[in-house]
Amino acid sequence: GESIVPSGAVAANALGLSTQVPMREMFLTSGPSRKISLGRTEVELRHAPQWQLKEGVAGAALRALLSFGEEYSAETLEQLWERLSESEKKQLVALRGSAPAWLAAAIGRQATRGEEAVVA
């Protein structure tokens, strides 16, 4: 079946990393890009690679960080890290292998900070 998950901007808002509410309803999908109407609301489904379609909090965290781009702040990543459970941190660390190099490196740096390193 087709996978559909919230976009990075929606994930960032849901995780409390952004107060901006996206103007358009956008989701990422394993299917083709398209727009569908649900009543008066138009929803955009944008095709994305499989690694961006991971479900759960760790998948949402990955999409949220990706939405900020390479200009993300270390402070944003620290805020996110504080909100994640140990299990979610491990899941995010495990997902970094499929992320772009800059994001994988940032997650790796965050995971090895502090008193205890988080290892997947």
Placement of each model-derived feature along the sequence:
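Hydrophobic alpha-helical interaction segments
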Residues: H47-A120
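Short gly/ser-rich loop at a beta-strand->alpha-helix junction or flexible surface loop bordering the NTP-binding
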Residues: G1-G39
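Short hydrophobic-aromatic micro-motifs
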Residues: P6, V43-L45, L53
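A short, charged helix-loop
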Residues: I36-A48
